[in-house]
Amino acid sequence: FSGHAANWKGYLKGIEAGDKYALELWNTIQNDAHYKGKTTLFITSDHGRHLDGVKNGYINHGCDCEGCRHINLLALGPDFKQNKIFTHQRNQKDIASTIAYMLSFQMATSKGEVMMEMFK
């Protein structure tokens, strides 16, 4: 919510809190014998943010600007390469196709591509 409130300091604190929650979740998974080494975690967002100079900047989103069209993805799990950052562009539909691939089901009408570069 801090992003929409035009509170940059709060926005950064929100990102920091989200990072801590993600780490806590991953550590919980890794400390559970049932899930450790067998669980995949995808963390992403449903949209990006305006870049500086576009409309009202980071406090909003929703157009087709460069910032709104890009999201981050953190993918953790035993099937993925570790400590790698992939910088080529992907689309949200590629996330769905990758998850479908991992679960061994077809998405016949999907236009997404499996993100094979992430796999070991």
Walk through the language-model features, giving the residues of each:
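Short acidic, glycine/proline-rich loop/turn micro-motifs
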Residues: 3-8, 54-56, 84
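Solvent-exposed loop/turn segments at secondary-structure junctions
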Residues: 1-2, 46-51, 78-81
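Anion-binding catalytic surfaces of enzymes that hydrolyze or transfer phosphate/sulfate esters
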Residues: 1-18
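Polar, surface-exposed loop/tail segments
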Residues: 90, 104-120
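Metal-dependent active-site segment of extracytoplasmic phospho-/sulfohydrolases and closely related
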Residues: 17, 21-59, 99
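A structural signal for well-ordered alpha-helical segments within the folded catalytic domains
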Residues: 16-23, 90-97, 113
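Histidine-centered active-site/metal-ligand motif
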Residues: 1-5, 47, 60-61, 66
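Substrate-binding rim/cap in mid-to-C-terminal beta-strand-loop elements of soluble/periplasmic
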Residues: 60-103
